[in-house]
């Protein structure tokens, strides 16, 4: 979207804070239904980020695939779980939680260090050269492929990591029963 600078910044800050709050809701809420709805909220807000960056196809694909299919599937799976069994086996803190929190915190700090050490000028220069290549492409599918592998590579990979974590969590929940 072509918005004015301050409006664009306000939307980015509100979407970012909503994603952070929704992510905290996914992790911290003890009711799995609330956690699944919070996950849907996060995925909708991520698709709004794609709309702000003028990638309407990726936003529509994310809404249809991740929110419309996968999140609804997660909600159905949670609704079919026996809630009383889940809460009887619920422990507030385990050794595995401590280990995974240490691992996740170290990954967070390594990502922060990587982001601070990255030369963003080279990345911007690379995407501008890809805009020249885009004019020669005839097919929309080729343009989508170029954009997914250059401009939207990071959001595409982050979404795939979120999906992988959801899949591992679903397998862990299925094994527990």
UniProtKB/Swiss-Prot annotation:
It is a multi-pass membrane protein. Pfam families: Oxidored_q3. This is NAD(P)H-quinone oxidoreductase subunit 6, chloroplastic. GO terms for molecular function: NADH dehydrogenase (ubiquinone) activity; quinone binding. GO terms for cellular component: chloroplast thylakoid membrane. Keywords: Chloroplast, Membrane, NAD, NADP, Plastid, Plastoquinone, Quinone, Thylakoid, Translocase, Transmembrane, Transmembrane helix, Transport. It catalyses: a plastoquinone + NADH + (n+1) H(+)(in) = a plastoquinol + NAD(+) + n H(+)(out); a plastoquinone + NADPH + (n+1) H(+)(in) = a plastoquinol + NADP(+) + n H(+)(out).
